[in-house]
Amino acid sequence: MARTRRRGMLAIAMLLMLVPLATGCLRVRASITISPDDLVSGEIIAAAKPKNSKDTGPALDGDVPFSQKVAVSNYDSDGYVGSQAVFSDLTFAELPQLANMNSDAAGVNLSLRRNGNIVILEGRADLTSVSDPDADVELTVAFPAAVTSTNGDRIEPEVVQWKLKPGVVSTMSAQARYTDPNTRSFTGAGIWLGIAAFAAAGVVAVLAWIDRDRSPRLTASGDPPTS
């Protein structure tokens, strides 16, 4: 039976590391893309302006159970330094483990859940510990179908963005409707089974036609049939 609800905590809190960066300029940009198969790929940037020449900014650890799906590299752009993590094809169940990439994680929690053909994103961002009014904290989510409702900014029909304000608690919500991949797979299997059955019936019919009785038959008058 196909599951109609699937829940996974995205827990991107580990990306913010707000406590150690509360007094410095902060840049956190997270972008995630949800595929029609309910797999999530994306990119995380966690960076800050260095306090000195030896400051390399916040670090993300790629040592997670699905490390083959995650690539972590140094980030250095526009005077910000830190880490950049790129991940691909994560399941809803794997996403919570991204929190293990940094032990100082705090600040943001997101959840994705499915209810039939509707995927619901809900989140809460507590940035009360961020004192820098110029902190750049941004989340972008791309769905595989048009967003039906959201409290974020729709930059495209399928893409929603939140620019989170420092010093306050923000909430995020969005919904999109697209077919449950489990249901779609079941339907596809049924179609192929139908095609296979139809093809098998065709083969049987052809074989029956080939093996039909080709012996001459007498007409009702007893005369042999004319050709």
From Swiss-Prot:
Residues 1-24 form the signal peptide. A shorter form (about 20 kDa) is secreted; upon overexpression of the whole protein in M.smegmatis the C-terminus of the short form is about residue 187, suggesting it is generated by cleavage of the protein before its C-terminal transmembrane domain. A lipid is attached at residue 25 (N-palmitoyl cysteine). The chain crosses the membrane at residues 190-210. It is a lipid-anchor; Single-pass membrane protein. Residues 26-185 are annotated as: Important for bacterial uptake by host macrophages. A lipid is attached at residue 25 (S-diacylglycerol cysteine). Disruption phenotype: Grows normally in liquid culture. Traffics into host (human and mouse) acidified compartments early after phagocytosis, suggesting it no longer arrests phagosome maturation as well as wild-type. Grows normally in mouse macrophages at 7 days post-infection. Initial uptake (2 hours post-infection) by host (mouse) macrophages is higher than wild-type, but decreased growth in host (mouse) macrophages from 1 to 3 days post-infection, wild-type growth at 4 days. Initial uptake of bacteria is the same in TLR2-/TLR2- mice. One of its GO terms (molecular function) is lipid binding. One of its GO terms (cellular component) is membrane. It is found in: Membrane; Secreted, Cell wall; Secreted. Changing residue 25 to A/S: Remains cell wall associated, no difference in gel migration, upon overexpression in M.smegmatis. Induction: Constitutively expressed in culture (at protein level). Keywords: Cell wall, Lipid-binding, Lipoprotein, Membrane, Palmitate, Secreted, Signal, Transmembrane, Transmembrane helix. Its main location: membrane. Disulfide bonds: none annotated. One of its GO terms (biological process) is symbiont-mediated suppression of host innate immune response. It comes from the Bacteria. An extracytoplasmic domain (residues 26-185, without the lipid-anchor, either periplasmic or extracellular) decreases phagocystosis by macrophages; when added exogenously to the deletion mutant initial bacteria uptake by host (mouse) decreases to wild-type levels. When added exogenously however this region is not sufficient to restore phagosome maturation arrest. A putative lipoprotein that seems to be specialized for the initial steps of macrophage infection. A non-acylated fragment (residues 26-185) binds phosphatidyl-myo-inositol mannosides (PIMs). Limits, in a TLR2-dependent fashion, bacterial uptake by host (mouse); this effect may be mediated by nonacylated fragment 26-185. Plays a TLR2-dependent role in host phagosome maturation arrest. Plays a TLR2-independent role in chemokine production during the first 24 hours of mouse infection. This is Protein LppM. It comes from Mycobacterium tuberculosis (strain ATCC 25618 / H37Rv).
